[in-house]
Amino acid sequence: MPSTYAHRRFGADVLVQLPRELREKITPYRPLYDMGLHGPDLMFYYRALQSNPVNRLGNAMHEQPGRVFFTRARGVVNTARNKNAALAYALGFVCHFALDSTCHPYVERYTRESGVSHCEIETEFDNQLMREDGLDPMHFFTAGHIRPNREFAKIIASFYENVTADETYGAMRGMVRVHHLLQATSPVKRWVVLTALKAAGTYDVMHGLVANLQPNPRCEASDKELEALYQQALPLAVRLITEYVEGLSNGAPLDKAYDHTFGEF
């Protein structure tokens, strides 16, 4: 998964390229679209420090072809009481899939070649994008667009099997908390966070999510390639979104792009 800022920025870039009528459907439900931009990653944050069925689902979904989720999502949108609200979440999710499926094969290859962790590669790319946008990676709160809300949680939960609205709300709150925790705004806090991760036994998995004080030179090549892949994914997302909306009414088969997982294959 390109990390939080990349998905957030990508979704905003896609939105301005969509047809006006579709933008007008999404805009009143922008918080749901914004949460959809993080796809199944949202579920990672439900009681994130301990393994449980909800956060394991987030991992499992990354290994499934996209069509598994998006086939189910068609039914959810078409039967929703508030169709546009459900649609906004689903279309944000399409953005997540387009960026993940485009970038992840490269990220996994570069991880093997460079020895830099998957998370660190993506966090470094996030930081590079923030610097390009005139933001300070050490102080900009990348999850500021996530707005925990029980009504939103009910809508989002309907897209997942065996996940309740309360669990979804907990995942939303968890996402905000974890991002606050891992935001190392000073060298001292960075040391405290990394020490805490070691004590909790989660250092190997999570340390790459803590921003480096200076760019990692080993990620210069990956930053450049991921920037190119990001641009490549933009027209893919616009096309998949447009076709997905059309398919809600005409039942056309999902694009072959959805044969790819959210991960490497």
What residue spans do the PLM features occupy?
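N-terminal leader/auxiliary helical segments
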Residues: 1-90, 98-265
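Aromatic-lined, polymer-binding surfaces characteristic
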Residues: 95
